[in-house]
A protein has these predicted regions:
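Conserved active-site-proximal phosphate/metal-binding subdomains
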Residues: 1-117
């Protein structure tokens, strides 16, 4: 859910970050630092591909994350993003996102029959 709201109209992150989420597709993320902690998922970029090839991420890679979030420098730090990245196809207002979540929930409940929530 976090990635969906980061890519909303109201999110304060730079438009470059939002656009990268939209453009990434289902294979647009990498799981980094698999053999250490913290394990993170981030959008593919030259930086994250390099980190993935090394197999381990030095936490100094996160030092410039403000430049990524607010200046739009997509190579400044790993752009944290969840598995839902590939399901996000447009930047929407939060109100619309929540309405769609509720509609989808209600649709699934109807398919489940008499289960009441």
């Amino acid at each position: 859910m976090g990635t969906r709201f980061v890519s909303s109209v109201e999110s304060p992150v730079h438009r470059n970050f939002k656009d990268k989420i939209i453009d990434s597709g289902i294979d647009g993320t990498l799981i980094l630092n698999k053999s250490s902690k913290p394990v993170i998922r981030a959008l593919k970029s030259d930086l994250t591909i390099n980190i993935d090839q090394k197999g381990e991420m030095d936490m100094s890679a996160m030092m410039n994350i403000q430049n990524l979030y607010f200046d739009g420098d997509m190579e400044a730090a790993p752009a944290l993003s969840g598995q839902s990245t590939g399901l996000i196809s447009e930047i929407k207002p939060v109100k619309k996102i929540i309405e769609e979540i509720i509609d989808e929930f209600n649709s699934v409940c109807k398919k489940m029959g008499n289960i009441k929530f």
